[in-house]
Amino acid sequence: MGLLKSHLTVCLPPSVPFLILVSTLATAKSVTNSTLNGTDVVLGSVPVIIARTDHIIVKEGNSALINCSAFGIPDLEYKWYNSVGKLLKEMDDEKERGGGKWQMLDGGLLNITKVSFSDRGKYTCVASNIYGTINNTVTLRVIFTSGDMGVYYMVVCLVAFTIVMILNITRLCMMSSHLKKTEKAINEFFRTEGAEKLQKAFEIAKRIPIITSAKTLELAKVTQFKTMEFARYIEELARSVPLPPLIMNCRTIMEEIMEVVGLEEQGQNFVRHTPEGQEAPDRDEVYTIPNSLKRSESPTADSDASSLHEQPQQIAIKVSVHPQSKKDHVDDQEGENLEVKDEEETEPSEEHSPETAEPSTDITTTELTSEEASPVEAPERELPPAHLETTEPAVTCDRNTCIIYESHV
């Protein structure tokens, strides 16, 4: 009876928590080996996981410590496996790597020294005793800090830069060869036919007169012809040069210059061609261009400067009608009164004696001849009228106006 009343005492390690001990005792199987004489009693339990760790993060080059976190009575036997299912052993590691990579510590600890990027993965701990077996898996993650990827990216950048430089150098070489060929073609062109075209253009440019306020519209028209001729030669020269289409159209440039200067508008307003035998219209100023000033039929199509001094074929001069001044009007009235008095005196004399009529007619003829001689004295300014009857409309139309008729050449 004294044996039944005796209390059981169990020695527990101080590092195990009290709660874990209670749970272990509740689930463990009690094994009692006793005799009738009251022999000793031995207790044990299956392995259990006291803490679970999902993953561990370690930088490359550092050491990693992985705990199995298993407990059991009696003491457990630990084995570690990597992600490919290989059993990790210190003896094998010493033979393969020279030792020191894998270290199996007491309490189910796995120490990995000098972790590399290839050591990443899952590690499984298998703990077992006479009562059972349990396993725990921990994932090891390695932070890549090695310079291998930096070297890789550097190599990629260097290769890309080399390719770009090769392409640029090739393009520059092609452009240089093209420019050399173009320069050679230009030099060859100007040594042969280009020199002749430049000489012709230079000769035309030398003949272009300078327009001033004292020049006439015919000279302006000649200047326009010469300038357009020079532009045509320059355009032909530019088109014949073996270059890409980078040279602008010279004719377009010259036309823009003409529009700015206003020569084209002046030529349209003041210069026009009048057919021969046709009277000029009633305008302020009408000029015709002689054929000698037009473009000739020569191969170079240039006109002579001496053609400016030739007489035009037809010039239409305006007929101006303007009022007389007061002094001229008084003189005309006095002259008309004198003529009327002379006519009145001659009429009675003719009635009385026909012989006395002859001196009066002589006086009138002398007056007429004196009137005719006045325009002859200045032949340089204008030509005299063909008949005296042309002056009669000036008297009959209006006494206050003077009409001047000028003939056509």
Curated annotation (Swiss-Prot):
Disulfide pattern: 68-125
Pfam families reported in the protein's UniProt record: Ig_3
The keyword Kinase is annotated on this UniProt entry: no
Residues bearing carbohydrate: 33, 37, 67, 111, 135
InterPro entries: Ig-like_dom, Ig-like_dom_sf, Ig-like_fold, Ig_sub, Ig_sub2
Statement: the UniProt record of this protein carries the keyword Glycoprotein: yes
PROSITE patterns: IG_LIKE (PS50835)
SUPFAM superfamilies cross-referenced by the UniProt entry: Immunoglobulin
TM annotation in the entry: 149-169
PANTHER family from the UniProt entry: MICROFIBRIL-ASSOCIATED GLYCOPROTEIN 3, MICROFIBRILLAR-ASSOCIATED PROTEIN 3-LIKE
UniProt function note: May participate in the nuclear signaling of EGFR and MAPK1/ERK2.
Name by which UniProt lists this protein: Microfibrillar-associated protein 3-like
Species whose genome carries this gene: Rattus norvegicus (Rat)
